[in-house]
Every structure is written in structure tokens, then in C-alpha cells.
A protein has these predicted regions:
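N-terminal cap/lid segment of alpha/beta-hydrolase-fold proteins
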Residues: 6-50
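Short beta-strand element of the alpha/beta-hydrolase
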Residues: 51-61
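The serine-hydrolase catalytic nucleophile loop
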Residues: 64-75
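Hydrolase active-site cap/lid region
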Residues: 150-171
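Alpha/beta-hydrolase active-site loop
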Residues: 104-126
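Glycine-rich nucleophile elbow surrounding the catalytic serine of serine-hydrolase chemistry
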Residues: 137-147
Length: 171
């Protein structure tokens, strides 16, 4: 389980900051009940806490992590375009993610609960434009984003679904 107090890897500790081209990445953990969820905010280069920004929450596919989403440069590019982005590791969503829960204990429904918990935390930030909260989901993260948005219609402005695994719902 992820330990928020101490880590062998300082790069996953709360508040760890990385300057990237045109944006800043900051580690920010949140919780779903007793489970710790590892995540990162990406802020535009000219970020100002007193302003509001459209926000994209990015959800990875099964067996993947937020680092895989990062490698595609999606969070970085969106932040460079003026969005605040939050990426995270689903609890149990991967064998090598940083969040709590064993891979064998993860389901689409537990991931839906994780995404909803992430949304709740993100929405508390003063700089979030509440009318412009977007969900981006890849593969199973696309299915989870669609299911979550269906339950939280008033909270989601739009979705970006990249090869969503809708077939899972049929199985």
C-alpha cells in the first residue's frame, strides 16, 4: 500500500514539483475511503490561483498508470493550452501503480468510485471552473469515465473517450 508519510521514492511524495516545458507538474494524493490515490496536477506556465481554469481529469486504461498517460504528453499539451489537468492511478488499476489496493481487487465499479472521489477533491479547488470540468478516459478508463459522467451529469461538461472499452459492460 502507498504510504503518504514516507516513501523510498521522493518523486511520489505530496507536493513534489517538476517543471516541464510550458507547465508545472505537482504530486497531489487524494483518498477514496481508506484508499490512497496517487495523482498529479499539471498547471499552465502562467497559472494564477486567483483565476479559474477549465480542468481535465485523465483516466488510464487497465494495467496502465498515470505515467503511461504522461508519456503520451496529453497532460503536458493540455496544460500548455491553458487547462489544469489531473492524472491519477486507479486503486488496483495496475500491477505497478502508486495507489493502494491489489490488482485482483479492482473492478470497473471500484474504479468508478475512485474517479468520483477524485472529482470531489478536484472540485474543491478554488481555481476550478465548475462549468468546465472534462473527463478524458482511455480504454477501460473511457468506460469508467462514461459511467461516472452518467451518474454525475451536472458535474461533467464533456468527455473525451479514447478507444473506450465499452465491450466490458457486455461481458
Amino acid at each position: 500500500d502507498a504510504d503518504l508519510e514516507e516513501s523510498d521514492n521522493p518523486e511520489i511524495e505530496e507536493g513534489y514539483t517538476t517543471e516541464l516545458e510550458g507547465c508545472t507538474k505537482v504530486v497531489s494524493w487524494c483518498k477514496n475511503g481508506d484508499n490512497n490515490i496517487y495523482g498529479q496536477f499539471y498547471y499552465p506556465e502562467d497559472f494564477d490561483e486567483t483565476k479559474t481554469y477549465p480542468v481535465i481529469i485523465m483516466s488510464h486504461g487497465i494495467g496502465s498508470t498515470s505515467q503511461m498517460v504522461e508519456r503520451a504528453k496529453w497532460p503536458e499539451k493540455a496544460a500548455q493550452d491553458g487547462y489544469v489537468v489531473y492524472t491519477f492511478d486507479f486503486c488496483g488499476g495496475s500491477l505497478n501503480g502508486n495507489s493502494d489496493v491489489d490488482f485482483m481487487d479492482m473492478t470497473v465499479m471500484t474504479e468508478k468510485e475512485d474517479l468520483s472521489a477524485v472529482m470531489d477533491v478536484v472540485k474543491t479547488k478554488d481555481y476550478v471552473d465548475q462549468d468546465h470540468l472534462f473527463l478524458l478516459g482511455q480504454s477501460q478508463g473511457g468506460l469508467v469515465s462514461a459511467l461516472t459522467a452518467a451518474d454525475r451529469k451536472d458535474d461533467v461538461a464533456a468527455m473525451i473517450l479514447i478507444y473506450p472499452a465499452f465491450c466490458i459492460a457486455d461481458n
